[in-house]
Each structure stands twice: as C-alpha cells, then as structure tokens.
C-alpha cells in the first residue's frame, strides 16, 4: 500500500545518507577536485581508484556520484556538470574553402586511425566574435594522448596561422618532426598554406568538406575550450598566457580512455623519450 511504499522510500533514503557518511572523505576529495581542478565526476572516481587513494569500500562509482548530485547529497548541481547537459543537435555547415588545399585524408596512413603511435595531430581554429581582424585560438590535439595545444593567433588569416605554427615547431627544437608527424586540417581558408610544411617532412592532410567528424578529437577538445571562452566572447579579452593556462588545466584532467592518466603526464613522458634518444 501507499504507507508501505513511503516507508521503503524513507528507509532507502536513510541508507543513502549512511553510505555518504561512510565515504565522506572520498566525497570531499571529489568535490575538491571538481571545483578546484575542473575534473569530471568520472575523472574524480577513476583517478581515486587508479591511484588507490582510498580503500575500494570507501569509494562509490561514477553512476552513484551522479545519483548523489540528483538527490542533493553533494554540494553540486546538474548545471555544474557540462558533460551532463544536453548538447544541441543542430548541424551547422562550416564555411570552408571548397578548393582542394592539399592531400585528402583518404591518403593518410591507415595506421593513424588506430591511435597507437604518438605524433599525429588534428588542427582547427576557434572563433570568438565572428568579425574581421578578430584574434582566434589555434587548437591542436594529438590523437593518441589527447593532449591539446591552444595558441592565440592575431587573426584568422593563413599568414597568421603559418607564423604561429612556425613558432610552435621552433619551440620543440630539432625534434619537432618526431613530435608532429602528421597534421589533419579542414578546408578552411586559414589552412590554405600549411601544405608547404610537407617540405619539412610533416604529413599534411585535409578532411572532406563539411565532415568535421573526420577530425573529431580536436572538435571535442574545442568544446572543452568553450568552458573558458564562451561563444561570442572576444578572444581579445584573453592573453596568450591565459589561453595556454586553459590548455594546461584541460591537459591536467585524468581521462578514462587513458587509464585515468592525464594527457600532460603522458605527453611529458613521450617528450622525455624523444629527447633522450
């Protein structure tokens, strides 16, 4: 009857609250990293388990953490969880240059699709206010390690992109071709000149028009950038150093797909290997 159902619900509620007390140290850990380090709930749970921060019986799984948020048992709200918000399914056609800019992604080595080798990057540009002469963010993401490099570029021109890429490669010294083996771009006019990089031994490939899914890794990380720079916000409002710090924050997030390692620590290990050779 109704009374019995209410009793069972109250009993279940008491059990939940008792469990929260049992795992209170773990929940403090979750809230701290969520608020201070911008970790997702899954990253908090997975990293704690992977590093044996707490005994397993003193933790709860990701699904339970989301349930706690729904029930008001954590000082977080669903609106604080960007990965839980419904994404718009409206498709936008990118204004891309239909002229063939270089080699098609169909010519890219099939091994790149496997994500087993380091050094294969996707590149994109992220706009602030869509106006002429406005700075943009040049966004690069490595396919295997999911590490991102975000650079403030003075404008959306091919010349500005070329200049920023040259500075980036210079920062890696004579090993830059081992760090950047291939780069995959779309047919945007800002990438009109990057095929010239093939003269230095870097493979440059272009996706088919209107198929952003062919560089889905960088597209996904662009959404993470929007946590810091919302659409319509002028990139002039941010310094180059601030934008690099945003990348550092994202690269410091433990990832389930990386065994709850961070892209930063795996990238550093890869660079150590390259420069030690």
Task: Indicate where each model-derived feature is located.
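Short, basic alpha-helical/linker "hinge" immediately adjacent to a nucleic-acid-recognition surface
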Residues: 1-36, 42, 47
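Basic, flexible linker segments flanking DNA-binding modules
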Residues: 9-10, 54-114
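Mobile genetic element proteins and their domesticated derivatives, centered on retroelements
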Residues: 30, 44, 65, 124, ...
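C-terminal domain-tail junction helix/linker
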Residues: 112, 231-277
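Short conserved beta-strand segments at catalytic cores or DNA/RNA-binding microdomains
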Residues: 113, 126-127, 132-149
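Active-site beta-loop-alpha junctions of metal-dependent nucleic acid enzymes
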Residues: 129, 133, 150-175
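RNase H-like two-metal-ion nuclease catalytic core shared by retroviral integrases
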Residues: 185-187, 192-197, 206-229, 236-248
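Short, structured coil segments at secondary-structure junctions
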Residues: 199-201
């Amino acid at each position: 009857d109704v009374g019995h159902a209410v009793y069972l619900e109250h009993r279940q509620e008491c059990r939940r609250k008792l469990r929260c007390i049992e795992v209170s140290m773990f929940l403090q850990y979750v809230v701290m990293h969520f608020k201070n380090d911008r970790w997702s709930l899954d990253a908090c749970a997975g990293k704690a388990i992977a590093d044996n921060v707490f005994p397993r019986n003193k933790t709860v799984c990701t699904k339970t953490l989301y349930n706690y948020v729904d029930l008001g048992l954590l000082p977080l709200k669903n609106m604080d969880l960007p990965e839980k918000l419904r994404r718009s399914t409206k498709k936008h056609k990118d204004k891309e240059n239909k002229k063939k800019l270089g080699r098609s992604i169909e010519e890219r080595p099939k091994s790149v699709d496997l994500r087993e080798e380091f050094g294969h990057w996707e590149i994109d540009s992220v706009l602030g206010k869509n106006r002429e002469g406005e700075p943009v963010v040049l966004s690069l993401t490595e396919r295997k390690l999911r590490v991102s490099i975000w650079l403030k570029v003075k404008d959306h021109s091919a010349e500005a992109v070329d200049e920023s890429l040259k500075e980036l490669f210079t920062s890696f010294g004579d090993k830059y071709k081992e760090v950047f083996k291939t780069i995959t771009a779309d047919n945007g006019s800002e990438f009109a000149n990057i095929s010239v990089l093939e003269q230095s031994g870097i493979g440059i490939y272009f996706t088919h028009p209107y198929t952003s899914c062919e560089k889905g890794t960088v597209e996904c990380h662009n959404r993470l950038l929007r946590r810091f720079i919302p659409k319509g916000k002028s990139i002039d409002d941010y310094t180059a150093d601030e934008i690099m710090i945003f990348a550092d924050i994202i690269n410091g997030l433990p990832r389930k797909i990386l065994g709850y390692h961070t892209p930063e620590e795996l990238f550093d290990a890869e660079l150590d290997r390259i420069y030690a050779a």
